[in-house]
């Protein structure tokens, strides 16, 4: 926070005391004094030539202590007829009366000037130059700066945590998507395995129906074979024809039938064993496939359960991260709201301090203007008093003495820039005025 203060230092070529002014209570005292025109006549070297000299008239000046409105005029008339003036007693008495009135007027002005200087000195001693010390606000400013820095650090830390939570949520979302795709693939595999199991069950049912049909066919063949054997036996037993021939002994039909029977029995047994072996091999293969499919199904179920547990865990973590994110965002909003309110209060304090500083500068400028007006009035009064004294003392009166005395006043303006109570820059400007 920078504070710019400016003050003026004045120096005059004439011997006029210069004093600094502080803020004075404003009083308005208005008094009007009408002073008659005074004339002073004095002989000059050139007789017969008239000279008319007029001094400047002064108007009232209103300041912090208030000065009466004064209007004075000196009218000096000198004629070339010196003998006429000295011989005229009436004019001499009038001249003396005018001098006496001028003397009394000068005494009154000196007393008024003394009173004015006394009031100015008393006002300066009472209040002194008002300098605003903003050092008492420095701890508050440092504390507020520290709070703002802490709030900025906390805000950055919260933003970092939110970013980390967002990245973690994105990672969990990617993992969830990958696990979901894996789950969908496993479910597709399970659906395919179920289809394979259904096909295997259909094949098993077809094989069982074929086995049943073969068993029925075997039973039917056995039954037909038994019937044929019984018919042959009946035919042999009921055959009563006996033929004796001298031919050699033929083959035994019973033996032949026995051989045929044994041959068919062996063929039936062989077919039965082959059918049984084929059926058992088919059943074994189907059982192996069923076992493999069952194991795969159990593994898939286990994997699906594991994936479900992982999905539930991830959903719980995702929900917790969402809750954490919501709480962090709420905390961030509260923090931003709180620090916005603090910043607004700081801005209000800053604006108030700037307003006070502006008011202080305006007061200093106003006091400087009042001081310049009082200084100008004082110099004019002193010039007028000096002129009256020369008139009363009867000294040589010249045209330059009656003219308004020109005085030069140097105005030195020093501008300093204060930062934290230290002067960081300074500039000086000097102006010269003539009065």
Swiss-Prot record:
Protein name, per record: Keratin, type I cytoskeletal 18
Gene name linked to the record: krt18
Natural source organism: Carassius auratus
The keyword Amino-acid biosynthesis appears for this protein: no
InterPro entries linked to this entry: IF_conserved, IF_rod_dom, Keratin_I
Tissue: Abundantly expressed in an even distribution throughout the optic nerve, localizing specifically to the astrocyte domains. Moderately expressed in spinal cord, brain, liver and oocytes.
Segments of this protein annotated with the region Head: 2-88
Region described as Tail: 395-435
Superkingdom of this protein's organism: Eukaryota
